[in-house]
Amino acid sequence: MKLEKLRNLFGQLGIDGMLITSNTNVRYMTGFTGSAGLAVISGDKAAFITDFRYTEQAKVQVKGFEIIEHGGSLIQTTADTVESFGIKRLGFEQNSMTYGTYASYSAVISDAELVPVAESVEKLRLIKSSEEIKILEEAAKIADDAFRHILTFMKPGISEIAVANELEFYMRSQGADSSSFDMIVASGLRSSLPHGVASDKLIESGDLVTLDFGAYYKGYCSDITRTVAVGQPSDQLKEIYQVVFDAQALGVAHIKPGMTGKEADALTRDHIAAKGYGDYFGHSTGHGLGMEVHESPGLSVRSSAILEPGMVVTVEPGIYIPETGGVRIEDDIVITENGNRTITHSPKELIIL
């Protein structure tokens, strides 16, 4: 099914074959979870090329592809495969292949023109299958469980790094392969940093703590943000929290298929601006989510992407005021036929520990 969908794109891409080298797209197309392998796909043939270390693994995981073990030169074996498949215009992933690698392929592939392709497999990944959504739901559940656990762990005097370590350890104990990304734990004045990765700062009473994390599970990512208070926060921070809470709720309530990313972004941005905090919301409302934590479509002021059923996106408005603090709240949602469905379920009302 995936092979045929990719082949159906060949015409509009102006190619008759595709070289897939990025690990994420290789895994999506083949099911291979190792770190050394690529795929060559023509209109009627498909080969997966790897080395001795992964041949047996590939025979188990990769279906519908001829398994080829290269004898020492991956690039030469790839060139030989392209020639045997009769490919004349070979698409390659321009956003992931380095110039050096491109030059190496160009030196040995003589019978085919190398054609840069911006998006091929990524277009297929936009719409998730029911099986993919089930995995994403499980990744989201692991993150939800981790949030519930970390509420029992956080207290004044604990460092942000200790919180991040505990979150990752707990998610792994629940089946996650790893964290989806370098998680954010930003407390006190550091919560005004939208991407304030965990530091050695100690959490203090009265701090707001922004936790942005996710579980990487069976090749898919969850991505959740909650902001909690450790001790009583100031009235200003409570006000900011309520504005973000209401903006995020508007987004989750009204995002639906047929809407552009820009229209989805406006749902949260317009509310924050109306409350006087527009200058303090400087990032997009959300992004696509799947095998990578940041995928298309974007929910931003510049996005003309049309939301479709089966897409999975985040909704994560925030307010960040230097020398004061910040708040972000984020959920993962699946676009449905009539609206959307939330797959992260951690409480969003302000929690004061």
Swiss-Prot record:
Uppermost EC category: hydrolase
UniProt superkingdom: Bacteria
Biological process, per Gene Ontology: proteolysis
EC number(s) reported in the record: 3.4.-.-
Cofactor note: Binds 2 manganese ions per subunit.
One GO MF term attached to the UniProt entry: metalloaminopeptidase activity
InterPro entries, alphabetized: Creatin/AminoP/Spt16_N (IPR029149), Creatinase/aminopeptidase-like (IPR036005), Creatinase_N (IPR000587), Pept_M24 (IPR000994), Pept_M24_MAP (IPR001714), Peptidase_M24B (IPR050659), Peptidase_M24B_aminopep-P_CS (IPR001131)
Binding site for Mn(2+) 1: 223, 287, 316, 330
Positions annotated to bind Mn(2+) 2: 212, 223, 330
Signal peptide positions (record): none
Record keywords, A-Z: Hydrolase, Manganese, Metal-binding
Obligatory cofactor(s): Mn(2+)
Family named by the database record: Belongs to the peptidase M24B family.
Protein name per its UniProtKB record: Uncharacterized peptidase YqhT
